């Protein structure tokens, strides 16, 4: 693996390692934010296509510049803070949401040589950022001094903390097989077989928990329009609301990238194919784009369950299945070692 990384690293990076690391970080994080912003347009077009509607098609050819119009509209809206809100916490909440979402991408290896940070505890860093992200919605819900915001914040905290338990346990099977929390080593451990095969149950639990943690449909109870009038960010507008909005799409891309990294071989080609002139990052992007589309498809095809049903499903179904998956994985590993 080290030889492959050295072979794909530019020559100037050996003389300027700090500059190379900074360039990687800026490029990857900038691309992530731009893709998250672009997802707004992509989601609307896909939903319109699947529902036999036109979708945004007025601004630019095929509506391509709709995202630019939306960004300009948000940027020029009044940066308003309610008089009855706790101003410091109110302003801090969207920054925390955006920062935790973007920083989580530090540990995602896009290719053998492309990644911001090669941490030995990459998965633990992701879980830590996911835990801190809960404070964003709590701050937003409480500081707004609005009953709907507070209910949305409480819902979000309970739902996120609950499903992060199942999210973490579902990852332990992958960690046990790979023998590492390092995401690069987890990808390299899948050269013979992708972990979707031995960890199919863990994959299903991770997908469900990932959707719940990102508050995407059908687990969008914290911001249910029909029940809570947008929930914890009902008092937000302008760029503050835009930061919450972009952070949600960044989290969608993040969970999709983690699914690819943990269960579908990351940058590895299917069946160990070696196609000339096709870089490893191509496979990573294609796989991630597929799961991003699945997030959008879930929004257009599934109904929203009640909040109590979501919590019951997590604790009564996801938790036992996650524990069974971990127990069986540990037993199989011990049998193979014996």
UniProtKB/Swiss-Prot annotation:
Organism taxonomic ancestry: Bacteria, Pseudomonadati, Pseudomonadota, Gammaproteobacteria, Moraxellales
Name of the protein: NADH-quinone oxidoreductase subunit H
Transmembrane segments: 22-42, 96-116, 121-141, 161-181, 193-213, 249-269, 277-297, 315-335
Assigned protein family: Belongs to the complex I subunit 1 family.
Biological process according to GO: aerobic respiration
Task performed by this protein: NDH-1 shuttles electrons from NADH, via FMN and iron-sulfur (Fe-S) centers, to quinones in the respiratory chain. The immediate electron acceptor for the enzyme in this species is believed to be ubiquinone. Couples the redox reaction to proton translocation (for every two electrons transferred, four hydrogen ions are translocated across the cytoplasmic membrane), and thus conserves the redox energy in a proton gradient. This subunit may bind ubiquinone.
Gene source species: Acinetobacter baumannii (strain ATCC 17978 / DSM 105126 / CIP 53.77 / LMG 1025 / NCDC KC755 / 5377)
Catalysed reaction, written as an equation: a quinone + NADH + 5 H(+)(in) = a quinol + NAD(+) + 4 H(+)(out)
Record-level Gene Ontology MF annotations: NADH dehydrogenase activity; oxidoreductase activity, acting on NAD(P)H, quinone or similar compound as acceptor; quinone binding
Gene Ontology cellular component annotations, sorted alphabetically: plasma membrane
Swiss-Prot/TrEMBL keywords: Cell inner membrane, Cell membrane, Membrane, NAD, Quinone, Translocase, Transmembrane, Transmembrane helix, Ubiquinone
Chief location of this protein within or outside the cell: membrane
Main enzyme class: translocase
Intracellular or extracellular location(s): Cell inner membrane
EC number from the UniProt entry: 7.1.1.-
Membrane topology: Multi-pass membrane protein
Quaternary context: NDH-1 is composed of 14 different subunits. Subunits NuoA, H, J, K, L, M, N constitute the membrane sector of the complex.
This protein's record includes keyword Zinc-finger: no
Superkingdom, natural source: Bacteria
